[in-house]
Swiss-Prot record:
Belongs to the universal ribosomal protein uS7 family. PROSITE patterns: RIBOSOMAL_S7 (PS00052). This is Small ribosomal subunit protein uS7. One of its GO terms (biological process) is translation. Part of the 30S ribosomal subunit. Contacts proteins S9 and S11.
Length: 156
């Protein structure tokens, strides 16, 4: 363990077009092989598609989508006397944001549309409407936590 204390949190600067840290975090999640300009093109064109389809502010739609994906509970493994229990714990806000962005990008990549921008735009739209694979992932996570409620007294 480190003797220097907890590590400092990385501060994400807002993106240049929308001035939003959420969009900047999404760009960083889409990023592959250090090609940030390509990731920016993908995210900005996806947000343009969202604006065309909904005629609403794309950042507001993105935030609504992330709110629908964000988990409040998750299960963590805890070993007690030779048995491993899935213990439900509350998700801290920072981790909840990270998980929602991760699920959004992962399930966007798994979609079948032609370009990544289309996949991301459609996943954002589905999530903002409470549909899509990323929202289903949150529901599954909550179901797991609910099913293992009996082990809640093992939480740390």
């Amino acid at each position: 363990m480190s003797r220097k204390g907890p590590s400092k949190k990385h501060v994400v600067l807002p993106d240049p077009i929308y001035g939003s840290t959420v969009v900047a975090q999404l760009i960083n999640k889409i990023l592959l092989d250090g090609k940030k300009s390509i990731a920016e093109d993908i995210v900005y064109s996806a947000l343009d598609m969202v604006k065309e389809k909904t005629e609403q502010e794309p950042v507001a739609v993105l935030k609504r989508a992330l709110d629908n994906i964000r988990p409040s509970l998750e299960v963590r493994s805890r070993r007690v006397g030779g048995a491993t229990y899935q213990v439900p714990v509350e998700v801290k806000p920072n981790r909840a944001n990270t998980l929602s962005l991760r699920w959004l990008t992962d399930f966007s990549r798994a979609r079948r549309e032609k370009t990544m921008a289309e996949r991301l735009a459609n996943e954002i739209l589905d999530a903002s409407n409470g549909l899509g694979a990323s929202v289903k992932r949150r529901e599954d996570t909550h179901k797991m936590a609910e099913a293992n409620k009996a082990f809640a007294h093992y939480r740390w």
